[in-house]
């Protein structure tokens, strides 16, 4: 792309955008996009690794991150059941593949972050099994209700949602998986999962309810109080005997 092309593209964007249009060459612009999403992937992986460590030591990772982020030069993102969408799970893969293919060595931070984030659904399954075992219930044959199966809150986009491997692994271990998501009428990625329409009744009946995505429409406290057991992977539920956090 020539400098003249860049100037004209910038002029076009300024017609309908209020933000600053910064011009650079196409290779740097592409690398910038990959870098942004890879950095977020690494940051989320750090938060997820922290959540594993804190769970083993009885530390509230959400409080820990909130306190650490009071430092003006610290900005740790939030842990969760995995990463999703068409950017964070994809761009770091593209970047690390090209580094290996063209330069002959690994992009170690990015590859480790991908490994950590990819294991989170399996970790959630293991924690779910532990919670049920505490109630003298096996995972096999238990009903697990997933709340929110999109990749981020308040949208219908399911691309690369961590809810997919989470549900698939629960089913593989013999659990009956149900889901509730007002944004998703037909969860084609996991056809074995049963969609429920009566949220309150489903939460009350399920052996374990897992908050996977925190849509604004969810009254988390009411749902947690109704549930037999409530596994909060987003750190939003208040403490109670029924609630277990990631």
Question: Over which residues does each language-model region extend?
Answer:
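Structural/interface elements that position substrates and couple domains in central-metabolism enzymes
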Residues: 1-246
């Amino acid at each position: 792309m020539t400098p003249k092309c860049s100037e004209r593209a910038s002029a076009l964007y300024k017609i309908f955008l209020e933000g600053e249009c910064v011009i650079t060459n196409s290779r740097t612009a592409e690398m910038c996009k990959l870098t942004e999403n890879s950095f977020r992937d690494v940051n989320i992986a750090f938060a997820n690794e922290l959540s594993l460590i804190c769970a083993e030591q009885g530390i509230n990772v959400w409080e820990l991150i909130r306190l650490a982020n009071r430092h003006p030069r610290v900005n740790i993102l939030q842990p969760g059941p995995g990463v999703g969408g068409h950017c964070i799970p994809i761009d770091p893969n593209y970047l690390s593949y090209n580094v290996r293919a063209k330069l002959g060595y690994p992009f170690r931070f990015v590859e480790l972050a991908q490994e950590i984030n990819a294991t989170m659904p399996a970790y959630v399954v293991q924690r779910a099994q532990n919670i049920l075992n505490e109630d003298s219930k096996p995972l096999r044959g238990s009903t697990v209700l997933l709340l929110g199966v999109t990749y981020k809150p308040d949208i219908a986009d399911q691309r690369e949602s961590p809810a997919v491997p989470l549900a698939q692994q629960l089913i593989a271990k013999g659990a009956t998986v149900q889901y509730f998501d007002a944004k998703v009428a037909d969860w084609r990625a996991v056809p074995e999962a049963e969609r429920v329409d009566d949220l309150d009744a489903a939460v009350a009946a399920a052996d374990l309810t897992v908050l996977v995505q925190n849509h604004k429409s969810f009254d988390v406290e009411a749902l947690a109080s109704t549930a037999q057991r409530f596994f909060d992977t987003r750190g939003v539920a208040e403490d109670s005997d029924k609630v277990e956090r990631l």
